[in-house]
Every structure is written in C-alpha cells, then in structure tokens.
C-alpha cells in the first residue's frame, strides 16, 4: 500500500519533468542560456527591491534600478564589453585566451585620442570631417596590427597564448602610459564623440527605434524560416511548427519590450532646451526660465524647463554598433567556413590539421579579428567619456572573459555562442551598475565579480560532466 502511494505521488512530478524536457527538446533552447536569462531577471529585480528599501525610487519594485533611464544607461555601458566578448568567444573556442584586451583597448584609445587632439585638429582645424574618419581608420588598423602580432607569436613561434597575452597586458599598458604621458587626452572630435552615445545626434529617436525593432522582428522570422528550409534540404529533424512560432514570438516580444523601454527615457531638460533653441523648435509657453534665454541653470528650474517639452532618446549609436557586431560575428561563426574551422579546431586540433585546416593561419586571423573588435570598443569607450587615459581598459580583460564564460563558452574549447557572451556581458555590467547605484564598496564589488566568475566556471564543469 505504501509503495503504491509513493509511486502515485511521484507520478505528477515525473510527468511535469517529462513535459519540460519535451518542451526544451522541441524548441532546442539551451538550458544554460535560460538559466542566465533567469539569473539576469533575478539580479534586476533584486537590485530594484533592495534599492526600494534603502533608497526609494521610481523603479518597478520601488527602487532606482528598473527605470527606463537606468536600463538605457546600462545598455550603453554594456556595449564596449559586449563587442569584445564576441571575439573572446572565438578565441576561447579555439582553446586560446587573450589577457591583453584591456591594455590593448587603452593603447588604441590613447593613440587615437593623441592623433585627434595633437595632430589632426591643429592641422585640419577643429571639427573637420576628415578627423573622425581618419581616427576610426587608424584605430581599426592599430587594433588589427596588435592583434595580428599576438596571433603570429602564438601560431608561428609556438608561444602559449597565456604567456603572449600576459606579456601584452603589461607591455601594451606601458606603451599606453608612454603615449599619454600619464595624462588624460581630451577632448575628442564632436562627430567622433557620437560613437559613445553623447548628444542628441547619437540618439536615433523613437520613430527610427521602432523601425529598427520592426526590421529585427522580420529578421527573426526570416532566420527561423531559413533555418527550417536548410534542415528540410539536408533532411535534418524539423522543429514542430508550434516551437518555431514560440521562438519567433518570444524573440519579437523581447525586441519590442526593449524598444519600448529605451523609447520611454526622455532627454534631460537642459539638453532638450538647447536642442530646441539650436534647431528653431517652438518651445511651449512657460517652459523657459525667467531670464528668457532658455537655459536651465538652477536646480529649482529643472522641473519647469521640462514642462511641455519632451524628446525620447531611443537606441543609441554604441548599442546599435554592439548589436551589429554581434550579428556579424554570429554570421561568421555559424554560416561561414571561417567559423566552422574555428569550432572544428577547438573541438579537436589534431583532427582539424589532418583534415587540411591551416590552424596557424586561422589563429592569426582570429586574433587579428579580436584586435579589430578591441579597436571598436576603444572607439566606443573613449567617445563615451570624450577622453582617453592609459587605464581606460583597466580590468576589462577580466570582464570580457567572465562574460564569455558566463555566457556558456567552455574554457576547454569547442563550445560557445555569441549571443550567450553578449548576455553574459549584460549580466556582468548589471552587477557592476547595480552595486555602484547602491553605493557598494569597491572591495565588495570586486569580490562579487570574482565569485561570479569562479561560480560560472564551476557550473561549466558540472555541465560538461553531465553531457559526458
């Protein structure tokens, strides 16, 4: 009797587990990705709830974290790390590592800033359109050169990547200090500063944000249909129609929700006033301050200046750059011979060489690509601050590696996704932003980040054992 009762009590649990397993199998959702999304939501809710207790705000749960403004800022802050994390995935998948990305970012940033401030601006004149174009090309070329140097030392001189990039971390950091002479190099060219999301011209606004969101939804639909067509062509198992519809709906809802959030963040009153005056936009009566010049200077005038005049920010240039880079690297990794060779080499280097893959050239190409991505991050970071220093990329290598590992990239090689790394970057930046917003001590923030990295590697080891 007791045996029958026990079996009966376990029946529903087994049925639920079986239903969940069937759902995951049908949709082919990665359990680690789902866990990371759940962790991200818990982090956001936790910071907002705790913030509501110690410092009430306008957030969803009474704090200051889950507000349109903070989410908008969070996405901008994540852009730089997310861009580098996409390249770090490919490097780790190949069973390599790059510890020099932080110092490389500093070197590229201060060199590009030095070129703008001390060479191009005096020669061409402040604001000349050739300044920002030359600076961007120079940054990409320098990043590619440094990345290529790392790749050559690793591939052809057979020096372990850990040693090469550890040396680069020190050497490139010293070179950055030498270029900047320990000073802050500023200001950047006005057009160049747009890459950091500074100013109204760097914000696409609500209309174009919704247009981009609609295009993204169409892209998700096309990607699902294309993948299904390819599966049918090569006689691979097909996902059920309901599973395909679920993936399209989930992706579309996520895109629309994020777009709604970024469109809900209005411009700062001073920025709105100045933009309206510079562009001859009518200002509603009673909005200007008593002096009549339209500039909000005193704190008690900020509310009055915001009345009747409102612009929404929408997506910013650095966020769009990060999304574009993520899409491009995802395409390279999954739809090109270059990407297939990377995963084949990471899965079994010896077999890859026997199959005719030039692993040495591939290594140089991957590290060169990493250098270009670091250069893009350097452009975003220095443009956002409108300045560059030799410690601009301090500890960035740790955050980038953490983002990749948290995103599901295996340190053993052969496994990793680009979107997972970008989600991992968002998780890491959420932790940093939340603890900073709540005035956590720097030591506490560092300890939390270190613990999260170790815990992520521990979970990766558990996952690999389970798969085996």
Q: Which residue ranges define each predicted feature?
A:
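Membrane-interfacial amphipathic/re-entrant helices at transmembrane-helix boundaries
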Residues: 4, 10-83, 119-134, 237-238
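Transmembrane alpha-helical segments in multi-pass inner-membrane proteins
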Residues: 147, 367-378, 384-449
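Membrane-helix/interface signature in polytopic inner-membrane proteins
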Residues: 226-240, 267-270, 274-276, 328-367
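Single transmembrane alpha-helix segments in multi-pass membrane proteins
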Residues: 43-48, 66-119, 145, 151-162, ...
């Amino acid at each position: 009797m007791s045996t029958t009762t026990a079996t009966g009590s376990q029946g529903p649990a087994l049925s639920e587990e079986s239903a969940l397993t069937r759902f995951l199998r049908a949709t082919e959702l990665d359990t680690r990705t789902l866990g990371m999304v759940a962790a991200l939501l818990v982090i956001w809710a936790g910071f907002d709830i705790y913030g509501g207790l110690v410092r009430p705000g306008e957030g969803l749960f009474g704090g200051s974290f889950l507000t349109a403004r903070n989410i908008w800022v969070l996405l901008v802050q994540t852009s730089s790390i997310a861009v580098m994390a996409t390249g770090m995935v490919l490097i780790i998948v190949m069973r390599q590592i790059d510890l020099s990305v932080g110092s490389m970012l500093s070197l590229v940033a201060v060199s590009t800033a030095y070129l703008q401030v001390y060479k191009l601006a005096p020669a061409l004149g402040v604001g000349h359109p050739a300044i920002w174009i030359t600076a961007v090309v120079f940054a990409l070329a320098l990043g590619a050169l440094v990345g290529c140097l790392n790749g050559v030392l690793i591939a052809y001189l057979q020096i372990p990547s850990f040693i090469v990039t550890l040396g680069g971390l020190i050497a490139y950091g010293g070179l950055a200090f030498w270029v900047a002479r320990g000073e802050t190099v500023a200001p950047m060219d006005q057009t160049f500063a747009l890459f950091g999301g500074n100013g109204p011209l760097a914000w696409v606004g609500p209309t174009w944000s919704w247009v981009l969101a609609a295009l993204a939804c169409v892209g998700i639909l096309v990607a699902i249909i294309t993948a299904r067509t390819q599966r049918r062509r090569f006689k691979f198992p097909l996902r059920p129609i309901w599973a395909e519809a679920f993936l399209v709906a989930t992706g579309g809802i996520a895109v629309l929700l994020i777009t709604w959030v970024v469109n809900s963040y209005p411009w700062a009153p001073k920025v709105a006033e100045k933009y309206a005056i510079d562009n001859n936009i009518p200002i509603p009566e009673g909005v200007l301050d008593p002096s009549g010049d339209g500039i909000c200077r005193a704190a008690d005038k900020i509310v009055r200046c915001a009345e009747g005049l409102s612009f929404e920010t929408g997506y910013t240039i650095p966020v769009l750059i990060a999304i574009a880079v993520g899409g491009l690297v995802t395409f390279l990794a999954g739809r090109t011979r270059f990407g297939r060779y990377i995963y084949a080499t990471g899965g079994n280097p010896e077999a890859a060489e026997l199959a005719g893959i030039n692993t040495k050239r591939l290594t140089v190409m991957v590290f060169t690509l990493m250098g270009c991505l670091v250069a893009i991050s350097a452009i975003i970071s220095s443009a956002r601050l409108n300045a560059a220093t030799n410690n601009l990329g301090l500890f960035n290598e740790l955050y980038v590696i953490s983002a990749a590992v948290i995103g599901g990239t295996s340190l053993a090689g052969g496994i990793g996704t680009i979107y997972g790394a970008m989600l991992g970057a968002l998780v890491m930046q959420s932790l940093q932003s939340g603890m900073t917003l709540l005035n956590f001590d720097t030591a506490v923030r560092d300890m939390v980040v270190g613990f999260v990295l170790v815990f992520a590697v521990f979970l990766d080891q558990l996952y690999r054992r389970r798969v085996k």
